[in-house]
């Protein structure tokens, strides 16, 4: 399966890595470079961008994904957008 995980904090990072270890294709998205650095070797692709920015979201291959997971916990409003 193809997953897109938006938000690579504690929860999103563990989820994305575990999905990848299970043989899934996982793309990770986060706006913090330290979160990107922590997973870039374990995920298929990573994007450093702000998921609250609609123009940035247009850069993501959303139509190619089977499942999109929003794992944004610090800004609840961003996770609802």
Regions found by a protein language model. Give the residues of each.
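Cytosolic regulatory regions of ion transport systems
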Residues: 1-81
